[in-house]
Amino acid sequence: MVPLEAGRQTIRFNVTHEGWNINYFTISVPVEIPSYEEVSMVNRWKNQYLTDDGSGVLKYAGNIDSDNIDAYSWDFIPDEDGYYTIQNQATGNYIVNDGSGFAACMAESGEGDSGKWILRNVSGYTKVTSLLDDTLSLALENQDSQNRVELAEAPDSWYSAHFTLNSTRFDYDIYPDKIVDGPYTMTADNGKELHSTYENNTWKLTKDISELPQFTAENMPISEALYNMALQESLEDIFTETSIHTGEKVEVFNTGANWNKVWTRDTAMSVQYSLAWAFPEQSGNSLLQKIQGDPQEWVEDTGTGGSYPASTDRIILAMAAWETYLATGDTEFLEKVYDVTKYTLEKDFHVNYDPNTGLFKGETSGLDHRSKTYPDWMDEGYFSDIMESKSCNTNIEYAVAFKVMEQASEILGKDPAETEKWAKHFEALKQAINDTFWMEEHGYYSSWQYPEYMGNVLAEKTDVIAAGYAVYFDIATPEMAEKLMENYPLVKYGADTVYPQKTGKNFSAIYHNRGVWPGWEAALMEAAMVGGNHELAGEIMKSIMYGAARNLSNEEVINYETGAGNDAHRQLWSVAGQLAGYYRVLFGMTYDLDGIHFAPYVPDWMVGPFELSNYSYRDATLNLKVSGQGDQVASLKVNGEEKGANYVLPADASGNYTVEIAMEDSGEHSAVNLKPENLVICPELPEMQLEDGVLSWTPDTRYTYKLWTGTEYIDVTGQDSYTIPQNVYGSYSLVAVDEDGIASELSEPIVWNPDGTVLKYEAEDASYNSDCFANSIQGYSGTGYVQDNRPNGGTDITFKVNVPVEGDYLVSALYNNGGDTTSGNYAAIRSVLLDGEDYGTMSFSITFDNAFYRSPRMRMHLTEGEHTITFTYNYNGNIYDQNMNISRNNLAMDQLILEDISTMSVVESPVQLGLDGPETVETNS
């Protein structure tokens, strides 16, 4: 008898007898039948959970009740033949086939085989079949009003009979060679293979990564395997395309397995995290591919409402360009991106800057899937409300661009007045962000602000990109940063992408809502390192490692409850976030103008020593070694010489450097907000009706209610109606609040205009080229509309308006811009002239085809009497109205609307950038 252990064994035969021949041999190793404890059973079809409510019948529910998790938690205990009993953690009851056609929950496991179950793997899911009658399986195919789980003759093709088993423990265990999470174990015996029981598959290192920075962890092979996986997936994400500048073939990054193109924000975030360090050439090439036009500007990708200026986060490319410069020191590259960023900012000041709040308008950066982030009513055929809203994280990206321009202008020897201008813009926008978006009662930033016509009220939710960038880029004050890092909501599998989660028509989609994005939580991870909350950095690093290990790829989205990936493999920002955990956390590197700073953090679940060799930085090659655990540098040696914790590797270093860092625990530990309650989902979106000046609604006794009037919240708990003040402009939205203080989204606004305060003018009665009159699109008012197709053809449209009372007015239009509302890039843009003078820009998202919709509102102060309001294209020789499509910029205008809001006290930010208007700049285009 020879005992055999788990894993690969080597058996040698020494044949000494002439004529002996071994044809075959058999080895039998007993297979250990796994038990699963504290696991939930999640159905594949509708993402429903099995639970025992004590009724005697197995039930299903849409979500786990966080106050009664044990009712959704099960123990699977095998017998010696591999058949399972399934016992509920809360009641102690067993799932039994009692012959009723439905699965029963009983105190005993039943007689004979009635309480025994066969578990089979079907397409990576678990099918639970009765041993008593193996033609019957647990299924949710025929759902009834009592939510009972049936026993059905379910073919393997039924998703309703497929279950995922997930641990209901709110943690998982990381060991040197494996990660264990309930029924799933991810194992690596070396850095070249990693096996996951989730889909019973193995990742293998198949590419040559020897030219890249090499990570070794002799005592923690799973960390080595995950690093190598990230390098391999980085190489798999590189492809070749023609440079738009030189016509030569260049290597660039695509966005992932499903996205074979350079994508603006994906590339920018990935480059900033780590790719600029590990792949500086491909990073620079990728950024330069996101330039277009004359003058040259950064590209906004296709998306919500026709891309720019519904989405305005293209300015994020400036931060990535800066990180690339820090990695390379290439001033020619810096000069190029300086000019591009300068013109982009000039244009954006005209197109989407709001001087009344000191903020830039546009969709949340990254969170660009409309009703997956915003209330459903903002996603109903047009996107004016998203266009007119202001996003915290996008404004932070603008502030970062100002800081980049300040530093770059000094390096490039620009006029000191220009450098000072950028510095002032940074400080002003930083203050506007903090004054506007910071929610002191929550200890973090609001994700976005509703439109001005609603009173600029804040959304009572936050997002991980805003949190991370606010700390990392020095937007938050030190006090804010400390609170934010301690309060930002974490769940078992990482940082909530948004919090709280929303209900609505896209609730079933695991995306921004109910998802963890490794490529976004990495922003909070790097922020936690510079902000000093090492526990937060470690938690996020651990979650990024878990997601890749379980799913055997750096997936884009991880289900925030189950840990399962969304099959978007080797997503670039997830790959880059994984590498950032090694470079920025474990080895503690940050790049600055003076060189590389080192401040490692080794969590107590990481077992060293760790080494990073063949690491290139400009003209130097580094070999980094980190030993010990903790957050404090005990010793730092360079080429054998003690240098101390404040050592900076110079930017002009050349040759070989060995940096050895010994770590110890400082004894200081920060708090993090990691708890099951952070899985919370906000109340359903309320609905209101207006009749005869009275708002009404049907209250839900589970909630309290507050009514937003456009200027303030009013407590309306216990009421089902509210009489509107007749002589005051208002924008009314209802908010439901649960017992834990979690607020719903604002209901669809009902705008009240006092009598005589709305002026309407038909477009066909304005001054325009008569050849542009049209009436083919249905739903217009009057006799038709004006079709203004640019850049080839079209017409200026000039309205004569008669203003009865001086005051502030909201100017808008009814319009159509039919097309692809989710992936087009031809939002219409027009300059607006008041009495022949440039007043700003009005933008028009893509809409559904055969209807007219309300445009964003522009706030305009008008004196009493006659005025002209003109919509024109590229006024006075500028090309601010050129959209991302360039060749299609079409607008059908039906009606001009002026709303007198003098009776409304509009909420304003006290801080403004103080611009007299955009400057004309010369660029090297």
Model-derived regions: residue spans:
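Short, solvent-exposed loop/linker segments at the N-terminal edge
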Residues: E687-L690, E919-S925
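Acidic/polar, glycine-enriched structural segments that form the non-catalytic walls/loops
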Residues: S167-N260, T331-F333, T344-K347, S409-I411, ...
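Conserved aromatic anchor
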Residues: D692-D700
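Aromatic-rich carbohydrate-recognition surfaces in CAZymes
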Residues: M186, N260-T267, V271-G366, S391-A399, ...
